[in-house]
Amino acid sequence: MNEKTLKILEFNKIIDKLVSLATSSLGKELAEKLVPDTDLNRVERAQKETSDAVAFIARRGTPPMGGIHDIRDSLKRVEIGAILNPGELLKTADVLRAVRNLKSYASNDRIKTDEDNIVSELIGCLESNKRIEDRIYMSILSEDEIADNASPTLANIRRQIRNAQESIKDKLNDIIRSSRYQKYIQEPIVTLRGDRYVIPVKQEYRTEIPGLIHDSSASGATIFIEPMAVVEANNHIRELKIKEQAEIEKILGELTGEIRGIVDSLKSNVSILGRLDFIFAKARLSLDYNCVCPVLNDEHKILIKKGRHPLLDKKTVVPIDFWIGEDFNTLVVTGPNTGGKTVTLKTVGLFTLMTQAGLHIPANEGTKMSIFKKVYADIGDEQSIEQSLSTFSSHMKNIVGILKDVDEDSLVLFDELGAGTDPTEGAALAMSILEYLRNKGSTTVATTHYSQLKAYAVTTKFVENACCEFNVETLRPTYRLLIGVPGKSNAFAISKRLGLFDDIIEKAKEFLTQDDIKFEDMLMSIEKNLNQSENEKMKAESYRLEAEKLKKELEEQKRKLAENRERLIQEARAEARKILLEARKEAEEIISKMRRLEQEVHNAQRQKEAEELRLKLKRKVDSIEETLELPLAPKNALVKPPENLKPGDSVLIVNLDQKGTVITPPDKDGEVVVQAGIMKINVHISNLKLVDEQKIVLNNSGIGKIGMSKAKSISTEIDVRGYNLEEAIESVDKYLDDAYLSGLTEVSIIHGKGTGVLRSGIQKFLKSDSRVKSFRLGKYGEGESGVTIVELR
């Protein structure tokens, strides 16, 4: 990609922002090297990894990227047999912890990630090693300190050192507190010189305390002496220190050996961590600028929806709509200076570079970007003082370089093409350059204020006009890009608004040719028509959004209706269960009374009374069945069609639960037109009810029957083999109801032998059932332990 183009379009500023969002030197290094790619497949993958990282952050929050160090040099040293120092080992442990934290971050999500999620794949390739990580942290406290418990030997040596040091301090304190030596001591303190314990002695008494002189004060008044009484002890400490250092070297060697065993894994981890840091930096850039992933193509088609230049103030930037590549591949943008033409060029160019670098772009969903092999830009004043080139010459030199390399896979951006020289010749050159690029098949966007180029765009195939809108009333540009409309100079209108005399303006108009006047009138007509089209488009979009909103509301109301219907059904089932329980209780009372009567005397009168009770029980059960078999009124059955419907009546559309107003009387088929919000709907009167007719009509026809269909003849056994325990108990419970009401005194429950779960669960249920008098396992010939025989009361 052309380096000059990257600079002109300020791609480097986007890279600077990206670098600042990376947390590690590894991620920053990758960000600094980022350049646009020209291969569609690679760009698609780069865009996808950015999208995947955005999805990760949206679901899981900010990833833990701390502790990612560049330990590649340390790993090289490990490979050649060197021993790592404590600082290097700590950084290695940090990397292992970073790996573990990222894997935990990725796994703490109940939402399954797409199988082809690039970020998930990378994190899955990381290899943690908590054992080595913990051992390093346990052994090393800082870059300068090894922990006592790094090894038992080190702990023992340091204990000996501390004991020896305390012994020396005690001896030296005895000397400085002794009345014999007090007048020789400069200060009653024990201090260190090198690694030897000494005491400060006055210069004039240095011979009074036998020992080794190690240092003196700056003034020479104090001599630091190691008394002979502690020389041997200091020597012992020195020996222990040597042993301590040797043990530390041994520990560092062992830890380095652990690292050597996983060096390949660590090298892979470092590479992946750097890549992840870079990818998450791209995701944060996308979120910071409210970006989207563009739809990619290699057909030179660009469609930008509400694109916002990322380097402009978010509060003031005006979004642009831009397209090229469908009906035209050359766009001529005209309009006043500072009207936004250059910003449009830079937005298109920078969006292309960002897209091909795998970065999201600040635009709306549905934005499409093409992959170009080459991107060229001639924007701004590139005059070279050193080469003594004029503005025109400087631009022309740049343009010549572009024209030499351009081809059909090139995007070319020109700002004020042909400016800086005679207008007639400049316009002619500009048209010739555009024609050359058009014949080459390049995608070209050029800004200009030459009227000749407007006419060229109108009359040339695959070339289109555009302008940056200018508000004559406020004398300010709106920065809106209008494609299909040539720009107007607005010189007369602006001059008039600024107070220029009318007679001067009218005289100026006389100098215009008739063709100029017709052309300006045509531009005014085109702009007016486009504005009307834009207004209609905005109005249509408003209607569309309102319709979508209404659709969502209707769907939500439909969902609530379904929920209410389900709730009513559940309530009805609960009521049915309540009725059944009451019936069971009453039946138990009747049967109990019947059995008492049968057991008293067997005369005809008693038998007659027993028969009456049996008939009463049967009528009760039949009554319950009839009650439970009454249908629930379906949602459409609750409506009684209104009579005498007329326009203006307020109605409720039942299946939509939406209020509306009748517009037409019923036709021959019983349909009326109803205004519901912004929609007019044909509805049958059976699906309507007047708003003031809120009565719910419940009849005995419809659907949704909830019934308790008891068999006319009840079997003496039930088979629940293959059921789970809950299903089995529910089936047994219902079966015992029927058997009990039918007057059976003994039934068999076939549960099978198996694991015994069904047998024990069912028998536990039977123990607490008031309908059961007793139960037992089957005997030989009855099914043995695979069957439970139940005696009913």
UniProtKB/Swiss-Prot annotation:
Keyword ATP-binding belongs to the record: yes
BP GO terms, sorted: mismatch repair; negative regulation of DNA recombination; rescue of stalled ribosome
InterPro entries: DNA_mismatch_repair_MutS_C, DNA_mismatch_repair_MutS_core, DNA_mismatch_repair_MutS_sf, MSSS, MutS, MutS2, P-loop_NTPase, Smr_dom
Keywords, alphabetical: ATP-binding, DNA-binding, Endonuclease, Hydrolase, Nuclease, Nucleotide-binding, RNA-binding, rRNA-binding
Described function: Endonuclease that is involved in the suppression of homologous recombination and thus may have a key role in the control of bacterial genetic diversity.
HAMAP family the record matches: MutS2
Name of this protein: Endonuclease MutS2
